[in-house]
Amino acid sequence: MRLTAKQVTWLKVSLHLAGLLPFLWLVWAINHGGLGADPVKDIQHFTGRTALKFLLATLLITPLARYAKQPLLIRTRRLLGLWCFAWATLHLTSYALLELGVNNLALLGKELITRPYLTLGIISWVILLALAFTSTQAMQRKLGKHWQQLHNFVYLVAILAPIHYLWSVKIISPQPLIYAGLAVLLLALRYKKLRSLFNRLRKQVHNKLSV
C-alpha cells in the first residue's frame, strides 16, 4: 500500500520531532550533568553524529522510495537535508565557541587550514550551506539543469563527513566505523549514477585540458 499525502504530512511532523528532540535532550544534559568528563567533546561529537545521521537518512530516501515503490517519500528528503545542515551548523558552532572560545575566534581560519580533518569538515559544511540555500522550488527553477549538478555534491559530503569523523577521534571505536560503512553502502546503491557522474567529470576535464 502506497503512502498518501496525508500520511506523508504526519511523517514530516515525526521527522521534525526527530530533529528537535535530540536538541532538547542536549540542553537538558548540559544543565543536569548528563554529559561525560569532557562535556565540550561530548557536545561536539553529539551534534556531529546527529548531523551524520540526518545525512545518511537523506541519502536513504531515494533508494527506499524506489525499491519500496513509495514515490511520495521523496517529499521528506528536503526536510531531512535541512535538519542535517542545522545539526552540522550546531556542530561547527560548538567547536568555534566551546573549543576555541569567543576570544579566540580569529584562530578558526588557521585551525581549519592546518588541521586536515577540520578542512574536510568545513568543506562539507560549505557544501551543505549551498544545498540548503538552493533547496527551494524557486531556486530549483532559477538554476535549471545546474540545480541537479549542484545537489550531486551531497555525494561528496557523504564521503568527506565520515572521514572527518574517523579522523577526529583519537581512538577508533566501532561507532565511526559503522557510520562510514553505512555511507559506503548508501553510495554503493548509487554506483551507476556515481560512475556516470565520474565519467562526465573526467570527460569535461579532458576537454578543457585539450583546448
Curated annotation (Swiss-Prot):
Q: Where does the UniProt annotation locate this protein?
A: Cell inner membrane
Task: Look up the record and give one Gene Ontology term from the biological process aspect.
Answer: protein repair
Q: Any keyword Transport?
A: yes
Cofactor binding remark: Binds 1 FMN per subunit. Binds 1 heme b (iron(II)-protoporphyrin IX) group per subunit.
Chief localization class?
membrane
Q: Which GO terms describe its molecular function?
A: electron transfer activity; FMN binding; heme binding; metal ion binding; oxidoreductase activity, acting on diphenols and related substances as donors
Report keywords, A-Z: Cell inner membrane, Cell membrane, Electron transport, Flavoprotein, FMN, Heme, Iron, Membrane, Metal-binding, Transmembrane, Transmembrane helix, Transport
Coiled-coil region list: none
What this chain does, per the entry, is described as: Part of the MsrPQ system that repairs oxidized periplasmic proteins containing methionine sulfoxide residues (Met-O), using respiratory chain electrons. Thus protects these proteins from oxidative-stress damage caused by reactive species of oxygen and chlorine generated by the host defense mechanisms. MsrPQ is essential for the maintenance of envelope integrity under bleach stress, rescuing a wide series of structurally unrelated periplasmic proteins from methionine oxidation, including the primary periplasmic chaperone SurA and the lipoprotein Pal.
Q: Which NCBIfam families match?
A: PRK05419.1-1, PRK05419.1-2, PRK05419.1-4
**Which family would the database say this protein is a member of?**
Belongs to the MsrQ family.
Its quaternary structure?
Heterodimer of a catalytic subunit (MsrP) and a heme-binding subunit (MsrQ).
Q: What is this protein called?
A: Protein-methionine-sulfoxide reductase heme-binding subunit MsrQ
